């Protein structure tokens, strides 16, 4: 019950030996019996069996006597069997073997299958020897498949025209089968004739029979003329004993083209020469012959399509080809040497089309996108998936750039690759750049000629292959130098003017930085270089169509030097007012000088903060005030009437910042003590202990120096503490805690120090202010003990927000 199941013996699979290329051997095969003796064996055995059993059996039929050969034929066969057959004769016969030639042409002569060496067999002892064929595709099978392909194509077209969808689908399936068989036959594989779809009746669409030439019989039993031999198979015609199936021709057969016949004959010679060279081991020569064979296919197709072909350049026979190729290479080398001295004639190759000049950025991006899209399509047509994916990514980059440009957003132009033959992308101040004409790339190159050498480098002329004559290109018409601009596009719009101004101003700072570096002013050069880099963001915004506030632009270096050197030393006589006009002029000059000083100080403050926009705004304002001040001084010096002026109320938002500190520093300044309440005010020695809370119950502790013999000491000592303004725990310290100051009186000999008072300063104001500066009463617990302590606590910027101050000034402005 629980015993293991006995393993079944492995069954021997019955294989059909015919699929391995062997003849199927029957099960009752007797190797001891002779051929042709099976017919009489059964009757003899039956007669013998009847005699043994006592019955009278029928008399056996007499065996036919074997036909004896004459003695002369027997001697001839023996002599032939003893004769040695040379291998050269077999190789000569194999040069025109259609099977081997088809196989060599099918794989391009580079990856040929392992050849089977023919075995010399003695002639059979019969008058008619049986010819054996290798299981490869013959010329007749390939031609039959091609004829059936034409039949089924025409039949499918007729069925579709007649509206018979059932027939069209049936013919389509047969056409697909024929295409698969044709592909296998071209590769040299074995084709079963029974698998070829049968012939179909092809009739013209109009219902009338096609005209039949007078010399041909209309009977269907008459075999049609054999079709032209394809370039992949051997050109030898089929043997007379091989029957050709009759086909129904759609159109009357046209007489063969003598040019095609001549080229096919020469192509056949080159095929045989390539096969012979390969067998002899000369691979390079075989490759050259195969290249010529492939180039013959191109020219034959051109001739069959009705194009004009010049046979004066057809390669010579294979025996003379190597000398001819060597001569052509020498001529090409001579022409290459003579090329710099003699101006060559223009080649008949049509020049590449010159694209129109791009008038704006969008058009330039579109041109480059179309270029990469064409290269991607060519790569897909060549089945080059790697190249197609690579150029597909570039196409996606350009599509995203065009979307960003249309949306008015900044576009990373420096990340976009430039296709060959195209110049840089146009800018606002540069003229439109047209892509330079480049040589045609490989997808658009003309078909290869037979002048290709063994190494793959083409010769200078196409004298080795018959090619179609090309027409000389017509001279290009002169293009207009001006580019038409659409009506809704303004050439000098605001965005382009801003771009031009920004580029000019950036160039000035670049030159100023170079000059400052040459003069040895490294700090000044660094400052100019920072301003030069700051223009990049403005240029990106302007190129994307965003408006730019030109009032925030930095003043050019030349005007800045004039602004710095605007102050002049005047004498007392020049400042004495002589009358009311001089008095008004002096007041105006003082007011303008005050305004100028305020602008320069605020400019320096914003510069130290790193606020470039604020610095540029006040610098431009200072430049305007400087011009007004110069005009007033000039009028006074020349005794001319003063210019008209008026006062305005101007508001300024000033950002307070302690620029001498960093963001991670807090400065504690113990300034002075005021009137300490002590017993000996003139002899007391005091100092201050400082305690600042830190994280994890730690604290920063320090003390000042001892100031002797005064109750109002000036300490003026500064201490810096490292803080972490982005840490939330540290922010809670500023909200809840404070700095503790303890004022001590120094004790005498063997006496300890005495606490005078304590001051606690809250840090919460530093959340919105950058400085705390005040005097605080000295406390003992909650009781004042008398005296005060002046303390200052500073940070670079407030902890939470920036400290803004709104200032309104009475501003003197000269009328234009």
Curated annotation (Swiss-Prot):
Segments for region (Disordered): 1-135, 157-176, 186-269, 418-492
Descriptive protein name: Coiled-coil and C2 domain-containing protein 1-like
Higher taxonomy: Eukaryota, Metazoa, Ecdysozoa, Arthropoda, Hexapoda
MF (Gene Ontology): DNA-binding transcription factor activity, RNA polymerase II-specific; DNA-binding transcription repressor activity, RNA polymerase II-specific; phosphatidylinositol phosphate binding; RNA polymerase II cis-regulatory region sequence-specific DNA binding
Annotated function: Phosphatidyl inositol monophosphate binding protein involved in endosomal protein sorting through regulation of the endosomal sorting required for transport (ESCRT) pathway. Required for full activity of the ESCRT-III complex core component shrb/shrub, probably by preventing its inappropriate polymerisation. Required, but not essential, for the efficient generation of intraluminal vesicles (ILVs) in multivesicular bodies (MVBs). Involved in a late stage of the endosomal pathway targeting transmembrane proteins of the plasma membrane for lysosomal degradation.
Subcellular location: Cytoplasm; Cytoplasm, Cytosol; Apicolateral cell membrane; Cytoplasm, Cell cortex
Stretches the record annotates as DM14 3: 365-419
GO biological process, one term: endosomal transport
Region (DM14 1): 145-200
Signal peptide: none
Gene Ontology CC annotations of this record: apicolateral plasma membrane; cell cortex; cytoplasm; cytoplasmic side of apical plasma membrane; cytosol; endosome membrane; nucleus
UniProt keyword terms in alphabetical order: Cell membrane, Coiled coil, Cytoplasm, Endosome, Membrane, Notch signaling pathway
InterPro entries for this protein: C2_dom, C2_domain_sf, C2_Freud, CC2D1A/B, CC2D1A/B_DM14
Region (DM14 4): 502-556
Residue ranges of every copy of the C2 domain listed in the record: 637-776
Effect of substituting residue 393 to E: Loss of function, probably due to disruption of electrostatic interaction with shrb
Gene giving rise to this polypeptide: l(2)gd1
Free-text domain note: The C2 domain mediates interaction with monophosphorylated phosphatidylinositols PtdIns[3]P, PtdIns[4]P and PtdIns[5]P, and is required for membrane interaction. C2 domains can mediate membrane interactions in a Ca(2+)-dependent or -independent manner; the l(2)gd1 C2 domain lacks three out of five asparagines that are crucial for Ca(2+) binding. The C2 domain is required for protein stability and cytoplasmic localization, and is essential for l(2)gd1 function. Contains 4 tandem repeats of the DM14 domain that mediate interaction with the ESCRT-III complex component shrb. The 4 DM14 domains show functional redundancy, particularly domains 1 and 3, however domain 3 is necessary and sufficient for l(2)gd1 function. DM14 domain 3 forms an alpha-helical hairpin loop with a positively charged surface patch that binds a negatively charged surface patch on shrb.
Organism: Drosophila melanogaster
Matching Gene3D superfamilies: C2 domain
Bias type Polar residues, positions: 483-492
Gene disruption phenotype: Results in abnormal vein, eye, and bristle development probably due to defective regulation of the Notch signaling pathway, particularly in imaginal disk cells. Accumulation of proteins in enlarged late endosomes, including N/Notch, possibly contributing to ligand-independent ectopic activation of the Notch signaling pathway. Failure or delay of abscission during germline stem-cell division resulting in multi-cell cysts that share a cytoplasm.
